[in-house]
């Protein structure tokens, strides 16, 4: 059984930390708590599991390692391996993904974005253009972390009611929303600054997502996609999620990469 040396960070107990709980509940892994801000896999503690959004924060430095699996920013180095990424609340997403998701005809929102700008880095990637002009259901509040318009359950349900969903850079080039869109089969509209290539299994344009450079391109792009094309993309998104970001899929991927680079 794979052993994970995990750190305990109560204020950040979501995303990968919540996924670790799910791996443990399913008896995929054995865990042991360690001090610090990083997680390790394997008995020798040689495999770094870097789930943090950035690698350049002086208060959260990357320690020495033999092989590192990186979820968001992936440094350009042979010891740094593209991994997968995680929803903000994997348990809630797992629950809605396991339900009967709305079909094409039942999705009454054509395009959607729900988010927030909480820091200058997010502002640079999200406020550089007026994305609200290209999205039918657009909500983005500005300011420090705090209350949101929707509960986490409402947010995921609403996301699943849309045919297309805009992705914008987060605190890193990937965002939890990217994975949430794939999970509920809402076809991503990928904006500049988003990284969809630095995964173990990269996203493929016009298979998993459509790409735009400006808000003005969005309506023409999504209008050109037929119902049958959307269904194919919807299914490809969900299959990618199952292979790479679901509870079982993310564990099998992690196990595969550790075995490959031992």
Model-assigned labels for residue ranges:
Residues 1-207, 211, 243-261:
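Nucleotide-sugar donor-binding catalytic core of glycosyltransferases
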Residues 42-44, 214, 226-229:
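Short glycine/proline-enriched coil/turn segments at helix->beta-strand junctions
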Residues 190-194, 214-215, 234-237:
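Glycine-rich loops and low-complexity Gly/Arg-rich segments
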Residues 215-226, 251-259:
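Two-component system phosphotransfer/interaction surface
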Residues 220-240:
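Conserved donor-nucleotide binding/catalytic region of nucleotide-linked donor-dependent transferases
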């Amino acid at each position: 059984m794979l052993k994970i040396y995990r750190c305990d960070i109560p204020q950040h107990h979501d995303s990968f930390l919540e996924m670790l709980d799910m791996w443990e509940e399913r008896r995929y892994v054995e865990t042991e708590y360690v001090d610090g801000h990083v997680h390790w896999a394997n008995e020798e503690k040689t495999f770094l599991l870097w789930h943090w959004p950035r690698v350049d924060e002086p208060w959260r430095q990357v320690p020495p390692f033999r092989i590192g699996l990186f979820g968001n920013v992936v440094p350009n180095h042979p010891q740094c391996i593209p991994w997968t990424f995680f929803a903000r609340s994997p348990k809630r997403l797992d629950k809605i993904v396991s339900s009967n998701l709305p079909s094409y005809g039942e999705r009454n929102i054509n395009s959607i974005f729900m988010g927030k700008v909480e820091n200058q880095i997010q502002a640079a990637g999200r406020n550089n253009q007026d994305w609200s002009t290209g999205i039918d259901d657009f909500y983005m509040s500005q300011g420090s972390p705090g209350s949101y318009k929707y509960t986490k359950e409402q947010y995921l349900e609403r996301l699943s009611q849309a045919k297309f969903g805009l992705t914008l850079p987060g605190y890193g080039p990937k965002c939890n929303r990217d994975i949430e869109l794939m999970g509920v089969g809402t076809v991503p509209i990928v904006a500049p600054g988003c990284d969809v290539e630095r995964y173990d299994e990269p996203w493929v344009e016009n298979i998993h997502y459509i790409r735009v450079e400006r808000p003005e391109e969005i309506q023409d792009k999504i209008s050109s996609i037929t119902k049958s094309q959307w269904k194919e993309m919807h299914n490809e998104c969900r299959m990618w999620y199952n292979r790479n970001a679901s509870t079982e899929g993310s564990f099998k991927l992690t196990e595969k990469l550790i075995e490959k680079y031992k």
